From Swiss-Prot:
Pathway: Cofactor degradation; L-ascorbate degradation; D-xylulose 5-phosphate from L-ascorbate: step 1/4. Belongs to the UlaG family. It is an enzyme of class 3 (hydrolase). The lineage of its organism: Bacteria, Pseudomonadati, Pseudomonadota, Gammaproteobacteria, Enterobacterales. GO terms for biological process: L-ascorbic acid catabolic process. HAMAP family: UlaG. Its cofactor is a divalent metal cation. Pfam families: Lactamase_B_2 (PF12706). Its EC number is 3.1.1.-. It is found in: Cytoplasm. This is Probable L-ascorbate-6-phosphate lactonase UlaG.
Amino acid sequence: MSKVKSITRESWILSTFPEWGSWLNEEIEQEQVAPGTFAMWWLGCTGIWLKSEGGTNVCVDFWCGTGKQSHGNPLMKQGHQMQRMAGVKKLQPNLRTTPFVLDPFAIRQIDAVLATHDHNDHIDVNVAAAVMQNCADDVPFIGPKTCVDLWIGWGVPKERCIVVKPGDVVKVKDIEIHALDAFDRTALITLPADQKAAGVLPDGMDDRAVNYLFKTPGGSLYHSGDSHYSNYYAKHGNEHQIDVALGSYGENPRGITDKMTSADMLRMGEALNAKVVIPFHHDIWSNFQADPQEIRVLWEMKKDRLKYGFKPFIWQVGGKFTWPLDKDNFEYHYPRGFDDCFTIEPDLPFKSFL
């Protein structure tokens, strides 16, 4: 059979997806985290892989799904949180713009799976399945009640799940995980389609969403999930030492407030008394596309006058950030390679070819 006749859509997908294959899985496994540091990788959206100096591996909000894929239905799903928020009827054009950089089914070494809340782009059945099938049988699944309900519904044993609410602390080897208040107002209007939000007192945020503070021997990481800006960030900053803070940033469409703005990101960094502030979530949805350089420009305008004690860092999906080695850097660039140039003799017709 000729090659063009043997190739199918399925063979094409299997040969190209996930786009990074197991490259990042291998990089994370091989990483030796130095004492006094921690390393983390951005998995897309708010997905983070954190590795401590003791070799403890945890992932948060690792999501392997996609967005809109067809114009077939021009209408938004009835009762969707964005419909409730803005009174819209048209389909939200939220296409996934980020490649899949980590293969969940190539994960072998992991010590905990966490989720901040139960929105589709923050918790994933494929990740749960991969960990259940391929990893140790005591890896815990940690999250607020709504997330645990999802995991159990997917088939994760109840005894493998840990429900957390603000104030709870869970120890996973050398990482101390503090569950803190979340400020995700969108989560409170994520309801069954037949349930009305108008005129009804929302249920408690604590069952739906949490923020996390990861305290490692080498430093601390604050993960804010999908939280909006809140003055209560200052309380978290008063009560905890926060080295690196991650915030959900994006360009909100007309009539929508779902992501923090550049000004919100700076206010969050100041309130938390963080050393480094990193935007995420802006990478994933086409209709929330935002330029993170705006954060740095605004920071440059304000830093001297307001005496900011933090710096912004502009990351790339799949990239690594090491605290405190990268604390004075402003931007990430993927490894460029070719550091071993001219270690062997070039094979060229003549030197002037160079």
